[in-house]
Amino acid sequence: MTQDSALLQAPEAIPSESLRDGSNSRKVFIKTYGCQMNVYDSMRMSDALARDGYEPTEDMEVADLVLLNTCHIREKAAEKVYSALGRLREMKKKKAADGREMMIGVAGCVAQAEGEEILRRAPAVDVVIGPQTYHRLPEALRRAKQGQRVVDTEYAIEDKFEHLPIAESRRIRARGVTAFLTVQEGCDKFCTFCVVPYTRGSEVSRSVSQIVEEAEKLADSGVREITLLGQNVNAWHGAGSQGEAWSLGDLLYRLAEIPGLARLRYTTSHPRDMDDRLINAHRDLSALMPYLHLPVQSGSDRILKAMNRRHTAAEYLALIERIRTVRPDIALSGDFITGFPGETDEDFKDTLRLVEEVRYAQAFSFKYSTRPGTPGAELKDQVPEEIKAERLERLQMLLLKQQQEFAESCVGKEIDLLLEKPGRMPEQLIGRSPWLQSVNVDAKASQIGDIIKVRITGTGTNSLFAEHAEAAV
């Protein structure tokens, strides 16, 4: 899952007027790094901490607990966390001198990868907790209050979601009309460049009943759009009411029946797990938005094999054709890596050719960075940094051109726009198009959550502009 996805958003603090006892509650500041799943995890940790009297704050200075929810995907991720912990150590010392206590916790994938090393290198840290054990965070903090320094990164036998509360309606409403919902975690693909199997573990799917219960609570609390999350979300599997095997497509058909829930999305997918049921869901479900993030990483079969992607460029292109046949208006997004070990100029040209053929609405691209413990780090023929950078620049120029062309192709179209949040100008709201673009339109704050018909009138640097086409629906 890309850490720079357009879906990325920070958890929002609940306004003080919505707190039951805002004057006496303890405050938690959560800094979220990385992917959408970390955003979701931060929200679930915040909800769990609420039962122990913690309420979120956006002001680190008033926080009784500072929690870093970390990501281990990019190069030097751990060192960036240690740098942040050094700054927090000084803040903790300053608060202690003023007679105020501040606890520091590290969660997420760096916590999983580093474990005890964090306590050794950052003595100010009180709690280290992994992504599979954060349901035990309140207990870890209670132990830390008693003077223990806690590391809890062992993969839990129990299902953490069975022990996590679903947020109260007031907290859901404060977060807006769109929401993330994790349905699957971990990955069994073992791509040679990726740390996810080592930090998130093997593939685990949440039960249908858990997912439906949470989705219904979100919809009842005013959420209009849900994005299903997973490191390999289309590997999700479960059982229907009669015990029959369900895939992600079956789950989407079920969620589309929930009253009030107008839109569905999912991310991130692996090409090998795009089955017929899921493809047909794009054909049949009006609630399933015509947008698909389907990473390919390279257009070279030789590099795809070295990456252990388990598909060829031709198979990926054939899959794209099948999807576009059933949903011609679908917009595609992807992930790319330049400079994987052994990548030649011809391999890179294969990637450019694939991009030209697919034509992406948006995409995310990165230079290859070695991740300790992955097979890719041991490969010979590491590509020089300057060549990685030059290839990345060329690729990004092509992807940006395609993104701009897609945005311009939307001008003049009438679309359904979900109004999400205030814009920069008075009497302006920002909405989300079916293709995940931000759209600016004149509207009142009372219309947030409405889906209105608009006509796209122009493009900006990272957004579109629109005018009303007809009344709200």
UniProtKB/Swiss-Prot annotation:
Keywords: 4Fe-4S, Cytoplasm, Iron, Iron-sulfur, Metal-binding, S-adenosyl-L-methionine, Transferase, tRNA processing. Coiled coil: none annotated. One of its GO terms (molecular function) is metal ion binding. GO terms for cellular component: cytosol. Its cofactor is [4Fe-4S] cluster. It is found in: Cytoplasm. Residues 26-146 form the MTTase N-terminal domain. Transmembrane segments: none annotated. Binds 2 [4Fe-4S] clusters. One cluster is coordinated with 3 cysteines and an exchangeable S-adenosyl-L-methionine. Residues 408-470 form the TRAM domain. Its EC number is 2.8.4.3. InterPro entries: Elp3/MiaA/NifB-like_rSAM, Methylthiotransferase, Methylthiotransferase_CS, Methylthiotransferase_N, Methylthiotransferase_N_sf, MiaB_methiolase, rSAM, rSAM_horseshoe. It is an enzyme of class 2 (transferase). Residues 1-21 are annotated as: Disordered. Belongs to the methylthiotransferase family. MiaB subfamily. Monomer. HAMAP family: tRNA_metthiotr_MiaB (MF_01864). Catalyzes the methylthiolation of N6-(dimethylallyl)adenosine (i(6)A), leading to the formation of 2-methylthio-N6-(dimethylallyl)adenosine (ms(2)i(6)A) at position 37 in tRNAs that read codons beginning with uridine. This is tRNA-2-methylthio-N(6)-dimethylallyladenosine synthase. It comes from Rhizobium johnstonii (strain DSM 114642 / LMG 32736 / 3841). The lineage of its organism: Bacteria, Pseudomonadati, Pseudomonadota, Alphaproteobacteria, Hyphomicrobiales.
